Amino acid sequence: MIELKHLYKSFDGKEVLKDINASFENGKTNLIIGQSGSGKTVLMKCIVGLLTPEKGELLYDGRNFLSLKKNEKKLLRREMGMIFQSAALFDSMSVLDNVMFPLNMFSNDTLNDRKRRAQFCLERVNLTGEAHDKFPGEISGGMQKRVAIARAIALNPQYLFCDEPNSGLDPKTSLVIDELIHDITHEYGITTLVNTHDMNSVMGIREKIIFIHEGTKAWEGTKDEV
């Protein structure tokens, strides 16, 4: 579980986040939604440790991230999978090599085992062997997002953070990506946070939804309550 307790963040004396309180359960998909400038991106950056709040607590399964030592934060970050607004793939690497990249960096498995793991993750997002040898520039935007999801789950993360995962996608493909993230969350028991301004994403999210407005939590509920 991820818990936010009385988080505050300011830039140049202006409060961007004001007394944010929220909790995100394990094995659930959680949507953080708000207009551009609402503070949702700053909130996500605070949660993953890219920004440091001035006040409050950020708890990962009871551990206050803000109080951890540098090496402890590094170990915790290895339990995080990230999906960025752009797919952020390496253009010079094949689809398979993109997914193998974090495995090559952090896994002690043999090369064959790392390759099998990458292939398994790609097949889980419905990308079969023919696509594995292609390069990012040779596949569609929707397929690139699938590769990004496969790469994010390659190291079996406990937490999955998705920053505008539907950016640049048509509504039909966006819904497919939302449902894929949701299904993987439940399959692996991951705590997932999806950050977006797209109200259509609500249709693919079945758990908690938090609306951020002018740096505060304006509303919290489920899809059925929206």
Task: Report residues per predicted region.
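Helix N-cap at the start of a conserved alpha-helix in ABC-type nucleotide-binding domains
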Residues: 171-173
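Conserved catalytic motifs of ABC-family nucleotide-binding domains
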Residues: 156
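Conserved ABC ATPase signature
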Residues: 135-139, 143
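H-loop/switch region of ABC-family ATPase nucleotide-binding domains
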Residues: 196-197
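Helix-to-loop junction immediately C-terminal to a conserved catalytic motif
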Residues: 48
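Catalytic Walker B motif of ABC-type/P-loop ATPase nucleotide-binding domains
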Residues: 160-163
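Conserved ABC ATPase "signature" region
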Residues: 64, 112-130
